[in-house]
Structure formats: C-alpha cells, structure tokens
C-alpha cells in the first residue's frame, strides 16, 4: 500500500503483513554504501558469518566488509545484525527515525529507561545473506525499512503448524528479558528443503512472500514467523512497537518468561483480555 493512514494502520495492525511503499521521509534515505563506508568505516559492528549451515558471531570494522562482500556465495556470506550500534553511534538513529505509523503509538518508551528495548536494529547484509526463521521477542509488531538494496521475505502466521520449524526457545538478551523463538536447523525457505516445507505449510496456513526496496518498509504482525534474504548488498533498519493492538501479547510474553525464571514466586494468572485475574 502507499500512504497508509493512521486510521487504516490501526484497523489493520496485528492481522496481516503489509508493505508500505511511500510515507517515509528521512535523511537516511540518501545513504549509499560509499557514504556509509566513508562516515563509519572505522566503527565496529556485530555480525554473523555463514559457511554452509555453520554460523559464527564476530565483530569487525565496517571497512572490512568492502573486501568481504566481493567474495560471497550462496553458502558463504556476512550479515551485520547489531542491536546496540544506535547507542554507540547516535547519529545513525537521528538520521533514521522509526516510521511515523509505528512511532505514533508506542508504549515501550513508557518503561523505565534501564529496561527499554533498543530503539532500532542495524541490518547490513551482503548478497545471499539471510536471517533465521524466527518470531520477534515479546510478540511485538515489527518493522523493517530498506535504505538501499533489496530484501525478500517469507511470513507465516502462528498456529499448530509451528512444529514444522523445530523451534527452540532461548533468551532474547534484551534489557527486559524475554523468550526468543527460533528455527534450529538453519532451514532456509529459499533452499530445496525449505520449498518443500512451504508446500506443506500452504496446506495448513497462509504463506506470504514479497520483497521490499529502498524507501519501503514491511510491518510484521505480532507473533508471526518470518525470514528475510538480501538479494544484493542491503542496508535496513528494524524497529518494533507495543501498541493498543498487541500490548496484551507483549505483557503475556513478559509474564511467561518471568514465570519460567522465577518459579518460586506466585504470579497472577494472565488472561488474553489483558487483565490480571486473582488465581
């Protein structure tokens, strides 16, 4: 859609993925790889290096990616996925604020500062790089804005078919801890095996596929499984929001984590209506 209004977004939110083609205007839309390299080539970023199904976490200066990106293959690539760089390099966030539709109603800033989530995630991937199949922490409503390059997507709603992904539950590592749900076998929806999984999934649930380019952003509904692949060198900024449509899921997911971590404490029963009931 183009020029989605606030009322239209409120009516949609939490139901289906949507690609917003226009309606975002910020200095970061002028960023290109060469400009980013000149400004932040000496900044260290957290990244993932892939060789086949092996993944290795590392950190390097951005300038090193200039050489690495020329030697990538479908089985060997690099993906910068840095949650904290906007705190270390504030001008990145200043030049690239969250999409207005998501920022208009966001309850996360109401939390105490020490447990607020990182406001944005810096994502810079070489050609062929891809995320895991995962669900975002807290079941928040996510966004992914492409500044340059192109990113392909597959999204699947939650349901009884979740076991197709062999999901593992780990800890998110965010300031306010939560569970993180992630496919464990390094499955790619774009692989031969992944296409077979999608064929089975389509018999049980809707599967959405699409792509976004410069200036476009995807809104990811609360609780949906998704995976992204970069078809060329691609810079994107991911964000999140807790709003009237998803705050029940966010609270429920927070309580679920702390119930698990603090078993000796008597927790109130949480109902999907968004209220705490006396046990």
Where are these regions (language model features)?
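N-terminal accessory scaffold of Fe(II)-dependent oxygenases
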Residues: 1-217, 225-279
